[in-house]
C-alpha cells in the first residue's frame, strides 16, 4: 500500500519520487540536474565558486539539483579531473529530509572504489564533511541521455540498441556486486562524447542503490515514477528484474520520444504503471521491426516473472537484434562494440576473462582486417606484436612447407613478444592469411596500458598456449610417424 508519493504536481511523467510510509514534506530529488547554476547569493548574481572542495581544486560548476551541486574539479595528487557532488548546506531545514539525504550520501559513499566497470562511473572518494558532505567521481566528458529523449533529437535505432546492450552488461555487473540501482533513467545515464558523437555510455548516481548484502537500515520505495517497476512502486522485494524494467522504459523513451506511460496527473500515472500496457513501438519509428518491440515489451512486463531471467539474457536479446539484422544499420557501419564483445566471449583464448576484462580488451586492442595472401609475419623479421585470431584462418610455412593452420581463438607471435632479447624476437616462419581474417593485436607498450588484473589473465592465457605447444612438441618427438 502506498502511503505517499512525493513529486511536483503536474510533472508526473518525469518526477523523481520517494515513497515512505510516514508523512513528511515534499522531498526533492537528490539527483543533480543538467541545468545551470540557479542559486544566486544575491538577486541576479550567481554565487562565487569555491576555490577548493577539500583537496580538490574547483574548475567550474557542472550542474545542480534540489539538494546538491556538482563541480568540475582537479585532483592534483592523481593528475585528473573529477566531478564532485556536494550536498548543499541547509541549516534550519527539515530534520527528516536531512536524515534521508544522509542515507543517500551513505549509500553512495559505501561504494568508493568498489565498482570497476567501463560502463559505470567510478566513485573515487567520499568525505563526510559535517556541513557539506561530498562524493568524488569520475568525470565524464559528455551529457546525460535526457536530451535524446526529445522527438527532435532521437538517436538511431542501432545506437539505442547498442546503448541498451552496454547498460544491460553494466547493470548485470552491478547486480553481481549485490546491488540494485533502483533509479535507472535517462538523467542517470551519461553519454560519452567524442568529437560530438556518442561513443560510449556510463551509469551514474548510486544514491538510491539497494545493497542486498548490507545490514544497515536502507530507504525503500525510491525512484523515478516514469521508470519504476510496479513491484518497486509497491515497496515489494526487488531483484535485478526491477532495474531491467527501468532500462526497458529508458530504451522505449529513446526510441519513441516519450516514456511508456505518460500522464500529467500523478494518480493517473500510477494507475497506468499498474494496469496499462505500453503502446507498441511498431510504426513509431521507420525501420523498427516487431522483434525490437518484443524485446522492449518483455522488459516492461508487469510481472517480473515475464521479463528476462537475468541480465545476460536481456543483453543477448539486444545483441541478437543487431546480429540478426533486426535493426537497420545507419551511421554505425563499422563493427559495433557489442559485436566485438560477443566475438571475444566465443574465443578459447579469452575463456578465463570476465566481462570487465573483455570490455577492456574491446577498447584497448588494435582490431585489424587482413585479406587472403597477406603476410602477417615473414621469417627473419623482428617484432613484438602478437595477434589473436578473431575470425578467419592463417597458415604457417617453414622453408616453403606448410606446418600448421591456425583458426579463431588462436594466438600467433606471442613467442617473439615474450622473448627476452632481439635475436629471439626474430620470427622463424612465414605466417600467411589463408582465409580473410580479423585479428586483435597488442604490443608490450599497449599491453601495459591494461589494468593489472587484465594483464594477469593474458599471462595465464600465454602459459596455457605454451603448455599446449610443449605438449604437442613432446608428442612429435615421441610419435614422429603419428605427427607426419
Which stretches of residues belong to each language-model region?
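Activation-segment/catalytic-loop signature of the eukaryotic protein kinase fold
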Residues: 126
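Activation segment signature within eukaryotic-like protein kinase domains
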Residues: 163-164
Amino acid at each position: 500500500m502506498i502511503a505517499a508519493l512525493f513529486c511536483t504536481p503536474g510533472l508526473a511523467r518525469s518526477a523523481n519520487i520517494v515513497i515512505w510510509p510516514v508523512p513528511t514534506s515534499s522531498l526533492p530529488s537528490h539527483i543533480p540536474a543538467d541545468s545551470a547554476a540557479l542559486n544566486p547569493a544575491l538577486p541576479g548574481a550567481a554565487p562565487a565558486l569555491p576555490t577548493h572542495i577539500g583537496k580538490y581544486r574547483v574548475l567550474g560548476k557542472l550542474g545542480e539539483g534540489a539538494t546538491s551541486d556538482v563541480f568540475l574539479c582537479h585532483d592534483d595528487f592523481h593528475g585528473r579531473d573529477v566531478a564532485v557532488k556536494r550536498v548543499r548546506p541547509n541549516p534550519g531545514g527539515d530534520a527528516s529530509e536531512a536524515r534521508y539525504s544522509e542515507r543517500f550520501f551513505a549509500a553512495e559513499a559505501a561504494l568508493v572504489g568498489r565498482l570497476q566497470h567501463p560502463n559505470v562511473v567510478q566513485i573515487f572518494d567520499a568525505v563526510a564533511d559535517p556541513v557539506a558532505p561530498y562524493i568524488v567521481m569520475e568525470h565524464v566528458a559528455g551529457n546525460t541521455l535526457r536530451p535524446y529523449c526529445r522527438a527532435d533529437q532521437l538517436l538511431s535505432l542501432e545506437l539505442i540498441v547498442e546503448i541498451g546492450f552496454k547498460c544491460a552488461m553494466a547493470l548485470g555487473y552491478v547486480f553481481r556486486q549485490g546491488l540494485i540501482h533502483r533509479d535507472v533513467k535517462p538523467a542517470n545515464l551519461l553519454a560519452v562524447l567524442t568529437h560530438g558523437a556518442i561513443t560510449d555510455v556510463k551509469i551514474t548516481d548510486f544514491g538510491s542503490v539497494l545493497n542486498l548484502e548490507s545490514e544497515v537500515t536502507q530507504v525503500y520505495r525510491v525512484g523515478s515514477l516514469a521508470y519504476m517497476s510496479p513491484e518497486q512502486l509497491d515497496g515489494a522485494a526487488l531483484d535485478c528484474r526491477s532495474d531491467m524494467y527501468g532500462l526497458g522504459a529508458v530504451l522505449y523513451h529513446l526510441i519513441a520520444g516519450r516514456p511508456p506511460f505518460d500522464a500529467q496527473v500523478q494518480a493517473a500515472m500510477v494507475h497506468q504503471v499498474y494496469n496499462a500496457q505500453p503502446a507498441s513501438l511498431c510504426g513509431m519509428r521507420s525501420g523498427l521491426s516487431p522483434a525490437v518491440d518484443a524485446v522492449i515489451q518483455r522488459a516492461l512486463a508487469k510481472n517480473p516473472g515475464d521479463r528476462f531471467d537475468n541480465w545476460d539474457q536481456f543483453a543477448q536479446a539486444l545483441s541478437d537484434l543487431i546480429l540478426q539484422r533486426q535493426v537497420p544499420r545507419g551511421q554505425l557501419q563499422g563493427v559495433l562494440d557489442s559485436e566485438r564483445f560477443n566475438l571475444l566471449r566465443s574465443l578459447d583464448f579469452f575463456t578465463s576473462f570476465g566481462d570487465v576484462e573483455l570490455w577492456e580488451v574491446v577498447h584497448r586492442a588494435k582490431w585489424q582486417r587482413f585479406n587472403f595472401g597477406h603476410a602477417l609475419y615473414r621469417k627473419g623479421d623482428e617484432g613484438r606484436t602478437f595477434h589473436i585470431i578473431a575470425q578467419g584462418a592463417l597458415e604457417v610455412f617453414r622453408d616453403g612447407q606448410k606446418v600448421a593452420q591456425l583458426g579463431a581463438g588462436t594466438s600467433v607471435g606471442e613467442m617473439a613478444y615474450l622473448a627476452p632479447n632481439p635475436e629471439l624476437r626474430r620470427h622463424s616462419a612465414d605466417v600467411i592469411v589463408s582465409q580473410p581474417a580479423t585479428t586483435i593485436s597488442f604490443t608490450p607498450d599497449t599491453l601495459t596500458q591494461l589494468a593489472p588484473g587484465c594483464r594477469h589473465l593474458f599471462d595465464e592465457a600465454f602459459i596455457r598456449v605454451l603448455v599446449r605447444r610443449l605438449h604437442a612438441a613432446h608428442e612429435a618427438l615421441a610419435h614422429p610417424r603419428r605427427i607426419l
